[in-house]
Structure formats: structure tokens, C-alpha cells
From Swiss-Prot:
Keywords: Cell membrane, GTP-binding, Lipoprotein, Membrane, Nucleotide-binding, Prenylation. Residues 182-204 are annotated as: Disordered. This is Ras-related protein Rab-1D. Residues 192-204 have a biased composition (Basic residues). It is found in: Cell membrane. Belongs to the small GTPase superfamily. Rab family. GO terms for molecular function: GTP binding; GTPase activity.
Length: 204
């Protein structure tokens, strides 16, 4: 007998954005519920696994922490492929990191799947007195691209879990819509040739 799959969905999610915006800290907070004041400069790419129970489904997230430095762009570009979700992070206290979001959107358009889910995240909201990026400005920017926006603090865990859960839910809903609306010429084929994926689903 074959064993039941450990999860219903498997999603690859990328964290991208300038160096120092807190991508690694967001990942550590979500995956391990930990925090470090030490600056983490990611060398290349690292990832963590986190399993969620969402809307009655078990979802396994593979979250990749990609370096933001320019010299790593050529290394990380290949990792855009196959990602179902991309979380674009900027630092609320660093105007340049927000200005560069537009360039990162260009990277996504160039390397990622056309229908990949995206989420704009303004991190470090705990530094209230140092905040320079206006929330409404960031929200308007996100709306112009048709993507959700949320502000977080990895240090005090504000909205961190919500950030990843909302991304997972958006991906799941998008894939559910795709599965439930097959093209007319695919219906007969699918009824005759059922997939042998063992219940696991991984889509771009």
C-alpha cells in the first residue's frame, strides 16, 4: 500500500528585496519564531520549510531567502523559476529600498512565472521614529501593480505570520480556480488519463 501524502500542496515562495531590509529576519521569525539583532548578510540562497494547516488543507512551504546585493542577481535569477509566490520586502526606514522595489518588480517580470502571486511587505515598523516610507504611498504603489500590501516587524512579530499565511492562501485559491475550470478540450483527456502524482500538487 502506498502511504498517504504528507501534504496537499507544496509551494515555493521567494523573499526578495534589497540587502538589509530584513528578509532573513522575517524568515527566522516565521519558521523558527526567533530573532537576532546581528545583521545577516545572506550568501547566495538559503531556505526553510514550514508546514501550515489552512482551510482544511496541509500546505508545505519552501521559503527561499535570496540575497539582495547586486552581485548576487545572476545567481538568484534561476531561483525565480518554479516559484508560486514572491514576497517583495523593503525597509520602512530606508527610502532607497522602497524606490528599488520597482526594479525588483522588473526582475520578477523577467524571470518569474507570469501568474506568480506577489506581496509587497514594508518591514521594520517597530522603528516608528525612523520611518520614512509613507504607508499610503506604499499601498498606492502596490495597488498600481494589483498586488496586496502589508507592513511587518520581524523584531516584535507584527503581521509576520499573517504575511506568509495570506500568501499561501492566495496561491492555494489561484491554483484551485485553475483546477476547477479546465479548458473544454482538456476535460475528456483528464477523464481518461488521470495523473499519478499521489495527491501532491506543485504548480507554477
Amino acid at each position: 500500500m502506498s502511504m498517504a501524502p504528507e501534504h496537499d500542496f507544496f509551494f515555493k515562495i521567494l523573499l526578495i528585496g534589497d540587502s538589509g531590509v530584513g528578509k532573513s529576519c522575517l524568515l527566522l521569525r516565521f519558521a523558527d519564531d526567533s530573532w537576532t539583532d546581528t545583521h545577516i548578510s545572506t550568501i547566495g540562497v538559503d531556505f526553510k520549510i514550514k508546514t501550515l494547516n489552512l482551510d482544511g488543507k496541509t500546505i508545505k512551504l519552501q521559503i527561499w531567502d535570496t540575497a539582495g546585493q547586486e552581485r548576487f542577481r545572476t545567481i538568484t535569477s534561476s531561483y525565480y523559476r518554479g516559484a508560486q509566490g514572491i514576497i517583495l520586502v523593503y525597509d520602512c526606514t530606508d527610502q532607497d529600498s522602497f524606490t528599488n522595489v520597482k526594479q525588483w518588480m522588473g526582475e520578477i517580470d523577467r524571470y518569474a512565472c507570469e501568474n506568480v502571486n506577489k506581496l509587497l511587505v514594508g518591514n521594520k515598523t517597530d522603528l516608528v521614529n525612523e520611518k520614512v516610507v509613507d504607508s499610503n504611498q506604499a499601498k498606492s504603489f502596490a495597488e498600481s501593480y494589483g498586488i496586496p500590501f502589508i507592513e511587518t516587524s520581524a523584531k516584535n512579530a507584527t503581521n509576520v505570520e499573517e504575511c506568509f499565511i495570506s500568501m499561501a492562501r492566495d496561491i492555494k485559491n489561484r491554483l484551485a480556480d485553475i483546477q476547477e475550470t479546465p479548458k473544454p478540450d482538456e476535460v475528456d483527456i483528464k477523464s481518461k488519463n488521470k495523473t499519478k502524482s499521489g495527491g501532491k500538487k506543485s504548480f507554477c
